[in-house]
């Protein structure tokens, strides 16, 4: 999946410890797929439905129920590193926000968006890296 997209993930993933790569790849696949639902033309007219379906699948996977393999892999990452389910759910909220809001009028609005978009990703990466201290998570949020 990573090689098919235009981001820096394929190169960056080589810099990660080998034991983290599959988990970072699972996070990337989860987020990239949801982002595609919000952005790609082929999902026009059904973007909310696809994001909602993805969330439903994540919730099922997190309960060891039938779900797409990609979500089962990501749910395994969440369990392995005790990542709060709220983080990926917040990220899905950000993708929904992308569908209704293109520009933000105030910094407060921008920070609220970041609370649901960039911050959860940074925090999930920190969990995978074994960093659980809330103070360090807040530092990540402020980047």
Spans of model-derived segments:
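Acidic catalytic motifs of isoprenoid enzymes
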Residues: 1-143
């Amino acid at each position: 999946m990573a090689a098919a997209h235009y981001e820096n993930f394929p190169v960056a993933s080589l810099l990660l410890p080998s034991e983290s790569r599959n988990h970072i790849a699972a996070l990337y696949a989860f987020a990239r797929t949801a982002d595609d639902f919000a952005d790609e033309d082929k999902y026009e007219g059904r973007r909310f439905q696809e994001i909602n379906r993805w969330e439903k699948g994540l919730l099922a996977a997190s309960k060891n129920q039938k779900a797409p393999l990609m979500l089962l892999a990501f749910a395994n990452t969440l369990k392995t590193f005790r990542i709060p389910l709220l983080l990926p759910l917040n990220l899905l909220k950000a993708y929904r926000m992308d569908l209704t809001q293109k520009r933000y009028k105030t910094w407060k609005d921008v920070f609220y968006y970041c609370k649901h978009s960039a911050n959860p990703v940074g925090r999930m990466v920190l969990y995978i890296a074994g960093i659980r201290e809330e103070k360090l998570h807040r530092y990540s949020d402020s980047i």
